[in-house]
Swiss-Prot record:
Annotated GO MF terms: mechanosensitive monoatomic ion channel activity
Gene that produces this protein: mscL
Disulfide pattern: none
Alphabetical list of NCBIfam families matching this protein: mscL, PRK00567.1-4
Record membrane topology: Multi-pass membrane protein
TM annotation in the entry: 16-36, 81-101
Cell compartment(s), UniProt: Cell inner membrane
Function: Channel that opens in response to stretch forces in the membrane lipid bilayer. May participate in the regulation of osmotic pressure changes within the cell.
This protein's GO CC annotations: plasma membrane
Major site of localization recorded for this protein: membrane
Name of the protein this chain belongs to: Large-conductance mechanosensitive channel
Organism placement in taxonomy: Bacteria, Pseudomonadati, Pseudomonadota, Gammaproteobacteria, Lysobacterales
Family to which this protein belongs: Belongs to the MscL family.
Length: 134
């Protein structure tokens, strides 16, 4: 089997296509969650705790200075506010995935498995067995 044909069969399998669709939807969902956290949740929490904008929270380790040549040396800053926003995004995404998986499991568990119908061979063998018992 040629390399190209093997690759084509691999790509056309259902799991790979499903994964590709999931990645695209996941990327779009990530953008939605980012907007939700940055534009709605963080400002609301900021208002509740005294008007704080989480994205601007930071800790300055070393202030900006000007060296002897007159060139500005930037400040050394830890921007922990963005980290807080990222944690909020993670929690929202994890919760959304939890709800989706819970709903899928509920749907799967509600559907009873159809009873297996025996094949014609099995039915014929049962008839032979029953007739031999008589």
């Amino acid at each position: 089997m040629s390399f190209i044909r093997e690759f084509k069969e691999f790509v056309m399998r259902g799991n790979v296509i499903d994964l590709a669709v999931a990645v695209v939807i996941g990327a779009a969902f990530g953008k939605i969650v980012t907007a939700l956290v940055d534009k709605i949740i963080s400002p609301l929490i900021g208002v509740m705790v005294g008007g704080i904008d989480f994205s601007k929270l930071s800790l300055t380790l070393k202030a900006a200075t000007v060296d002897t040549a007159g060139k500005e040396v930037p400040a050394v800053v830890i921007g922990y506010g963005d980290f807080i926003n990222t944690i909020l995004q993670f929690i929202i995404i994890a919760f959304a995935i939890f709800i989706i998986v819970k709903m899928i499991n509920k749907v799967i568990n509600k559907q009873p498995l159809p009873p297996e119908t025996p094949s014609e061979d099995v039915l014929l063998l049962r008839e032979i067995r029953d007739s031999l018992k008589k």
